[in-house]
Amino acid sequence: MSDLKTALGEAVEAAFAAEGVPAELARVTASDRPDLADFQSNGALAAAKRVGKNPREIATAVAGRLQGDPRLASVEIAGPGFLNLKVADAALAARADAIAADPRAGAGTVPAPRRVIVDYGGPNVAKPMHVGHLRASIIGESVKRLYRFRGDTVIGDAHFGDWGYQMGLLIGAVCDEDAEIRALVDQLNASGDPNGEIPAAFERVTLADLDRLYPLAAAKGKEDPAYRDRARKLTADLQAHKPGCYLLWRRFRDVTQVALERDFHALGVDFDWWKGESDVDHLIQPMVAELADKGLLVDDQGARIVRVAREGDKRELPPLLVVSSEGSAMYGTTDLATILDRKREFDPQLVIYCVDQRQADHFEIVFRAAYLAGYAEEGQLEHIGFGTMNGTDGKPFKTREGGVLKLADLIEMTRSKARERLHEAGLGEDLPAEEFEDIAGKVAVAALKFADLSNFRGTSYVFDLDRFTSFEGKTGPYLLYQAVRVKSLLRKAEAEGAQAGPVTVAEPAERDLVLTLDAFETALQEAYDKKAPNALAEHAYRLSQAFSKFYAACPILAAPPPVRGSRLTLAQATLRQLELALDILGIAVPERM
């Protein structure tokens, strides 16, 4: 079931080809002047240079071939050779009926589905999430849902930061603070089972403890060589699976993951894999040996590197540092081992890394090393970077005291504002308290997510809670309000026994709504190709606006039966498509407000 833009594009291509003009020039787009036409093609201007003809002459010939197309009410030529296409009311009605009957509301799927991994979130053991994790989580979740909706087999991986020197620092800090735990770690290191049950004494350790101790330990590690050396030894003991260190580390990981899952759940974010850096630790030594066997490792002042620079690079990329001069595997080494692990377990055709754009060079270096090693084919690894969420001062968002705001606090702050906004608008006040809280939570998440996803991911934006939570303007709460309004209308229609029926298109607001519904596939395709959900967010907003104008201009329940049935069908199609779009954005719609 093609959308109108695609179907008309094929017709225009055929007309161009029949005139001896390359069909690929006949691109059809939504009209820049919707007051004059629904779609346009500027191909005659590009074709004129190619075939040596006057563009208006080409456009006239193409228009003549399109005149008999029943889908078109008119084909007109404007300016030097622009083709303006206006769709017939009957064709719009047929398209609306097809969208309304389609569970996917007119959305297609990719012709060749792929196996895809989306790496996003980026949480770390011992650290509660902060506002810096918000964009990775929101954008990554939406990209995962988008690719899944288009038909790909997709795995979302949190890529848990749970290994390395910081774990040794934490083990030492916890042991220093709790003599019983220190004694138990020593005892278990001597004669324990790393796969056994976590001792009750270890269960006393909370995420708040880890969050408090880590910055102190990190600072001391920089100042005190003996403290740093002990942390390195504890890290080595952990990586050797010494039972005391390993069981305490498991407690760190478990208590962190529980808190992280709670925060992610509040945001409507979930993962298929919670794989950590620890999951690939066993691969690193054999991988390093393999890189050496392939002649990719180069000794460099005691370190071992992979050179990734290419002829023609506009700037010099440093090599991938695989093993430090001290013999330690590095951060990029773990990333490379993760690529290898994913290839063996899932063999993805595409891995998307949703990480701050400031990490672009790091990923380019790792990806090139992976291509050299044969762990992925060129182009299978892609970093989609994003900008920062800034305060009103234009700098990355912080608390009033200048500290980093925890994500849980940001969510609660937004939920509190959502409650206030609901009360101001007189919404949900007659509902049970539990339902009101659920609605406030959905409004808060919609506010945060739409504010982020309505921007192209590469741009930064200013955090403005008052604007984000408004029920007016281009906001998540506005979209929820429009969706709930359609639900209310359809419930009322059902109570009155009103039935949906075949669509007829007569009013300008009906035309605009159907054309907007038809644009869903174009928005999905753009979002998918660019890995940029803002195209879909923009469509959801335009659809909400189009329905609002239709609702104001076209009586529904008060209309005579044939017209009422048609307009109810348009309302049903709008709701389904809007809910699908919002779900891909990770936004849930309440039943009522």
Swiss-Prot record:
Mind telling me which InterPro entries this protein's record contains?
aa-tRNA-synth_I_CS, Arg-tRNA-ligase, Arg-tRNA-synth_N, Arg-tRNA-synth_N_sf, ArgRS_core, DALR_anticod-bd, Rossmann-like_a/b/a_fold, tRNAsynth_Ia_anticodon-bd
The keyword Flavoprotein appears for this protein: no
Major location, coarse class? Answer: cytoplasm
- The encoding gene: argS
Q: Top-down, what is the taxonomic lineage of the species of origin?
A: Bacteria, Pseudomonadati, Pseudomonadota, Alphaproteobacteria, Caulobacterales
Q: Which PANTHER family match?
A: ARGININE--TRNA LIGASE, CYTOPLASMIC (PTHR11956:SF5), ARGINYL-TRNA SYNTHETASE (PTHR11956)
What Enzyme Commission number(s) apply to this enzyme? 6.1.1.19
The record's annotation in CDD domains points to: ArgRS_core
> Might you report a single GO cellular component term?
cytoplasm
Q: What is this protein called?
A: Arginine--tRNA ligase
Please indicate the residue ranges that the annotation assigns to the motif 'HIGH' region. 123-133
* EC top class, as a word: ligase
Which keywords annotate this record?
Aminoacyl-tRNA synthetase, ATP-binding, Cytoplasm, Ligase, Nucleotide-binding, Protein biosynthesis
Q: Give the record's family classification.
A: Belongs to the class-I aminoacyl-tRNA synthetase family.
